[in-house]
Amino acid sequence: MDNKPRRDRKIDSGKRRYLPSSERKQEILDAAFEEFSRWGFLATSLERIATRAGISKSGIYAHYPSKDAIFEDILVMALVPQDSHSTLLESGTTDLSEILDRYLDRIYATLGSQQAIATFRLLVAESGRSPDFVQRWGRKLLEHSLVGDRGFLDACIERGIIRADVSLDQYLLAGAPSALWLVLMTLFGAEDNPVSLQQVRPLHRRLLLELLEPK
């Protein structure tokens, strides 16, 4: 089941429905996204989220300890690939080109989704209302992503697939094409994006190969 926030789903608050935990959490995330988009994070209360989701405030606490935890879940589910990159090594291959192709498939499928673009728009809007808040969450999101990336890089180094002296800073900079592509997708949409996936992905791949390939 898709565990990312679905922005287009209307939540019926007229009658309490008993749902599995995963579905209830999904409704909370959908409701929270709508409220955050309308009012901003600071002005949105758990009561507003509960009302839109059609549950009580205590119903939210059964799944999330705070509004911050809800916001973090929205960001991580929309902007960070849900499967660990280390799963790319499960086939046993040591071919760096093959691994990178599968890695980029995962990255661009995540960042090109409507959920990711809508969430990035929310972050941009929120940065005007409360820049300190967005910087804090941006750092948390980056840390969450880099922890997984570090584990992936270490596993590749252990297998002799990539250079042993690759730093996370270098790896982050090599990912700049995907960040630019997400910004342009957010600004222009898929139809009018001046930089196509067919242009940006080969550049991203080449930068990663130059950085990671054993010398």
Write out the residue ranges for each language-model feature:
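Short helix-capping/turn signature of helix-turn-helix
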Residues: 41, 64, 124-130, 140-141
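C-terminal effector-binding regulatory domain of bacterial HTH transcription factors
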Residues: 210-215
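Amphipathic alpha-helical linker/stalk segments
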Residues: 74-103
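Amphipathic alpha-helical packing segments from all-alpha helical-bundle domains
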Residues: 110-113, 118, 131-158, 202
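Short amphipathic alpha-helical segment with a characteristic S/N-K-E followed by hydrophobic residues
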Residues: 28, 66-72, 81, 133, ...
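Basic, helix-initiating cap at the start of DNA-binding domains
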Residues: 1-39, 43-55, 62-69, 94
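Hydrophobic/aromatic-rich alpha-helical bundle segments in the mid-to-C-terminal region
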Residues: 135, 154-207
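Helical hydrophobic small-molecule/effector-binding pocket
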Residues: 98-129, 178-180
